[in-house]
Swiss-Prot record:
Gene3D superfamilies registered for this protein in UniProt: 2.30.30.30
Gene it is expressed from: rplX
SUPFAM superfamilies in alphabetical order: Translation proteins SH3-like domain
Stated family: Belongs to the universal ribosomal protein uL24 family.
Gene Ontology terms: cellular component: ribonucleoprotein complex; ribosome
Molecular function GO labels: rRNA binding; structural constituent of ribosome
Keywords: Ribonucleoprotein, Ribosomal protein, RNA-binding, rRNA-binding
Organism: Rhodopseudomonas palustris (strain BisA53)
Record protein name field: Large ribosomal subunit protein uL24
Pfam families: KOW (PF00467), ribosomal_L24 (PF17136)
Organismal lineage: Bacteria, Pseudomonadati, Pseudomonadota, Alphaproteobacteria, Hyphomicrobiales
InterPro entries in UniProt: KOW, Rib_uL2_dom2, Ribosomal_uL24, Ribosomal_uL24_CS, Ribosomal_uL24_KOW, Translation_prot_SH3-like_sf
Length: 104
């Protein structure tokens, strides 16, 4: 199955403590059905000291379930994603809200 949310997409959070906030997807984990979004779902982790890195408490993004995020359409509102086959046989993602192509 083709991925509806991909790396580089601008998404909005639908549920949870970050509801309504937007960010860019920088990693997708299809096996876990999760994604990492820049600036969203920030958690604090205790980092052990290594030769290369100093120890302490660091803040980093935790994975968020794909069902809890949606792509932001051209109008700035969340939209569902569908697929359309073009005349040349190429499969593209389209926004269900507006019908506009996402892969431009």
């Amino acid at each position: 199955m083709a991925a509806k949310i991909r790396k580089g997409d601008k998404v909005i959070v639908l549920t949870g403590r970050d509801k309504g906030r937007t960010g860019e997807v920088f990693e997708v984990r299809p096996a876990d059905n999760k994604a990492l979004v820049r600036g969203i779902n920030i958690v604090k982790r205790h980092q052990k000291q290594t030769q290369a890195q100093e120890g302490g408490i660091i803040s980093k993004e935790a994975p968020i379930n794909l069902s809890n995020i949606a792509i932001v359409g051209k109008d700035g509102k969340p939209t569902r994603v569908g697929f359309k086959i073009q005349a040349d046989g190429k499969k593209v993602r389209v926004a269900k809200r507006s019908g506009a192509e996402i892969d431009v």
